[in-house]
Curated annotation (Swiss-Prot):
Belongs to the type-B carboxylesterase/lipase family. This is Esterase-5A. Its main location: secreted. Keywords: Disulfide bond, Glycoprotein, Hydrolase, Secreted, Serine esterase, Signal. Pfam families: COesterase (PF00135). It comes from the Eukaryota. The active site is at S210 (acyl-ester intermediate). The gene is Est-5A.
């Protein structure tokens, strides 16, 4: 009799925890979703369920097409214990001449759930990885830091990159933005399935860094984004950055065809058919033909404005026009930058060349007018060579005056890169959203240099001060392999505050956002633009204004 009562209580407990697909105490590693059952891994303080397909493989006839939802039914339990593969890419961080990595069949999500006996369900953070739309992957931004805090479920997403994800002829036949469409389908998958993992589908926060941050903003510019997410954060990247929306992409796409043996194609239909017949490795390896030097320009293939008659077009207007129309998702959004974000792009100029021992920055004295349009992404936006040269001349005068390019003037070059590639667009996007949007818009700037950052890594220099460069903030949230894991005490505090900020934003019932003891100021309806300044000493709300090329903070 006692045994029967015990079994009844156990069954009732199982039902309360969510028998219909939710994580249960009976076997938290075994999850059931519409495709069948999958088994994850116990990692000590968290569970992982990795490389779960959300789309049919984008290969063969599905290459350069809108992704199709994954429909296969598993007869056996799916093994979700293997890490996700990289989408095929030409990766700038690989040493040597062959930088090809990854595979074409890569459209998966990975779910990481903390062990936490005090709660059964968790808010969800969905992360879109960065990498200039050209490289990177879901494992690039590690999950250990977030799992250690034990307060949110993390979902990472693989999406098509480079030419496989972003070729476009600008018409309906080869419209482009396949990587963005992958992201969109993955977010729908999360919304529909995350409850089975113990996630709260009503509390999904979408975040991204660099190209991932720009992707978040682009996703948000679709009105239906509010159906898949509650809020969003763009770290050091937004849709208005000059490297995001590609101009001249039609010409590069046909040039790509010529390089891989499709030079006979004179229209989009013929080109697309030919490209589908070529090995993916040849298409991706052709990226190197579009680089002027090193990894410049770092985004030869990226998001494009599509033709209105394109099938399932992602965006058909420039982001500025979309924001001004007010027809975008009205969800709370935060956009950020670091004080020296441009160090990621400028640091390569300090690398000493193997052949001469000279820094590349010295060559700018003779090649500024040739290289600047590619370094700062205005090559395709200028009507004439004269316009381009005039702008290049103006930039040099504004930031360097009459000084020469040298190691001594590097700091001002880096400041130029920060302003033009990251900082100015934050001010413009916040201003536009506060004028034409209804939901809260927040901003913050991070100023606390890491001991080792991408500046030192990309330049190979430890004798130069780079300041707070690209990633110094977000790498305190997501651990990365190329940055030392040991952190200063102040960074450990900031890391916990950042992760708590994500949880708070995902759970907020009144759309507010906070970091530590500081509450972000909503810019919608405010007289002045506000941003939160975060340093090793704490946080403080400040006023933000912008004059021509430079954004100044008034205390």
């Amino acid at each position: 009799m006692h045994l029967v009562r015990w079994l009844i209580c156990l069954i009732q407990l199982w039902i309360q925890l969510g028998a219909a697909g939710s994580v249960t105490l009976l076997d938290p590693l075994l999850i059931e979703i519409p495709n069948g059952k999958l088994r994850g891994r116990d990692n000590g303080h968290y569970y992982s369920y990795e490389a779960i397909p959300y789309a049919e493989p984008p290969t063969g006839e599905l290459r350069f097409e809108v992704p199709k939802p994954y429909k296969q039914q598993w007869t056996n339990t799916f093994d979700a214990t293997q890490p996700p593969v990289l989408c095929m890419q030409w990766n700038q961080f690989i040493n040597g001449t062959n930088k090809l990595l990854g595979v074409e069949d890569c459209l998966t999500v990975s779910v990481y759930r903390p062990k936490n006996s005090s709660r059964n369900n968790f808010p969800v953070v969905a992360n879109l990885h960065g990498g200039a739309f050209m490289f990177g992957g879901p494992s690039q931004y590690g999950h250990e830091n977030i799992m250690r805090e034990g307060s949110v479920i993390l979902v990472t997403i693989g999406y098509r990159l480079g030419p496989l994800g972003f070729v476009s002829t600008g018409d309906a036949d080869l419209s482009g933005n396949f990587g963005l469409k992958d992201q969109r389908l993955a977010l729908l998958w999360i919304k529909q399935n995350i409850a089975s993992f113990g996630g709260e589908p009503e509390n999904i926060l979408v975040v991204g860094h660099s190209a991932g941050g720009a992707s978040v903003h682009l996703q948000m510019l679709r009105e239906d984004f509010s159906k898949v997410a509650k809020a969003a954060i763009s770290f050091s990247g937004n849709a208005l950055d000059p490297w995001v929306i590609q101009q001249g992409l039609r010409g590069r796409t046909f040039e790509l065809g010529r390089i891989v043996g499709c030079g006979q194609a004179s229209d989009s239909v013929t080109l697309k058919k030919c490209l589908k017949s070529k090995p993916a490795s040849e298409i991706v390896s052709a990226v190197q033909s579009f680089l002027v030097f090193s990894y410049v320009p770092f985004t030869p293939f990226g998001p494009a404005i599509e033709s209105p008659d394109a099938p399932e077009a992602f965006i058909t207007q420039h982001p500025i026009d979309i924001i001004k129309s007010g027809k975008f998702a009205q969800v709370p959004w935060a956009v950020t930058y670091t004080t020296e974000d441009g160090g990621y792009n400028a640091a390569l100029l300090l690398e000493k060349q193997a052949s001469s021992g000279r820094e590349l920055i010295l060559d700018l004295n003779d090649r500024w007018f040739d290289w600047a349009p590619y370094l700062l992404f205005y090559r395709d936006s200028m009507t004439t060579i004269k316009d381009m040269d005039d702008y290049s001349r103006k930039l040099r005068q504004e930031y360097l005056g009459d000084r020469r390019f040298s190691v001594e003037s590097y700091w001002d070059v880096q400041r130029m890169f920060t302003d033009l590639l990251f900082k100015n667009s934050v001010t413009v996007s916040v201003d536009l959203h506060r004028k034409y949007g209804k939901s809260p818009v927040y901003a913050f700037v991070y100023d606390n240099p890491a001991e080792v950052g991408v500046g030192q890594i990309l330049s190979g220099r430890n004798d130069v001060y780079f300041g707070t460069v690209h990633g110094d903030d977000v790498f305190l949230i997501f651990n990365v392999s190329f940055v030392p894991a040991n952190r200063r005490p102040d960074e450990q505090i900031i890391s916990r505050n950042f992760i708590k900020m994500l949880e708070y934003f995902a759970l907020s019932t009144n759309d507010t956002m906070a970091y530590g003891d500081c509450v972000f100021q909503n810019n919608v309806g405010s007289k002045h633009m506000q941003l939160l300044s975060i340093t090793r000493d704490g946080c403080e709300n400040k006023q933000l204004n912008c004059f021509i090329q430079r954004c100044l903070i008034f205390f």
